[in-house]
Amino acid sequence: MQLLMLEQISLASSVVATTVLVAPVLSTIINLLTNFGQRIFIAADSSKSTSMEFLSTIIGAGYPIYKTYLLLELPSKRSQLLPKAFQLRNEEHKSIEEERRRLMAYWCVYGCVTAAESILGRFLSWVPFYSTSKIVFWLWLLNPRTQGAAFIYASYISPFLSDHKAAINNFLEKLVQFTTRQPLVLNAWALVKSLIDKLPKGDVEAPGSDADTKKSK
């Protein structure tokens, strides 16, 4: 009986000793697997976020740039090159001007969003599904059926600028007066102006002039 008890005690001691030796190894393996899994998840999430940001840039900036190009330079070919969902319904000059106004309203909204992102970029990056939501937002702004850009411009941007127009003009006047009194600023502006004067100059007619009419014929 005593021999059996001694064997059980010895076996238990061996198990405990083995556990003590193996536990750190198992803990290390588990930590390595956990860290590896976290890195894979972070890499996958980062790759997905990068892809969504790229798609957001294509929709939010790439397409409007191309659309602006078509409306300014190729009015006769826009119906062939624009997707059907974004085509003008008729070829009247009034419709072209309305489409240009909607596009200018879009660029105003886009500028506001870009300015907000430059300030709140670090915080917005932590918002779940931010890139996906931004894609939906761009589509809502651009779609001629929803006319989201025109709505935001008329409802928020235009009233805000109208209410603060005097303050903005006053600030700009003071800024000009301040900068014109600073020799360093004047010298810097003279340098910038000299560099601008050295850039190539084109001889083109303004968008919306007779050149558009000639191209559309």
From Swiss-Prot:
Keywords recorded for this protein, A-Z: Endoplasmic reticulum, Membrane, Transmembrane, Transmembrane helix
As one GO molecular function, the record gives: membrane bending activity
Q: Which cell locations does it reside in?
A: Endoplasmic reticulum membrane
Q: Name one GO cellular component term.
A: endoplasmic reticulum
Cytoplasm listed as a keyword: no
Membrane topology of this protein: Multi-pass membrane protein
Provide the transmembrane region boundaries: 9-29, 54-74, 103-125, 135-157
Q: Which InterPro entries match?
A: TB2_DP1_HVA22
**Gene Ontology biological-process entries:** autophagy; endoplasmic reticulum membrane organization; endoplasmic reticulum tubular network membrane organization; macroautophagy; nucleophagy; positive regulation of autophagosome assembly; reticulophagy
The superkingdom of the source organism is: Eukaryota
Family the UniProt entry places it in: Belongs to the DP1 family.
Q: What is this protein called?
A: Uncharacterized membrane protein C30D10.09c
Q: Which organism is it from?
A: Schizosaccharomyces pombe (strain 972 / ATCC 24843)
Q: What is the lineage of its organism?
A: Eukaryota, Fungi, Dikarya, Ascomycota, Taphrinomycotina
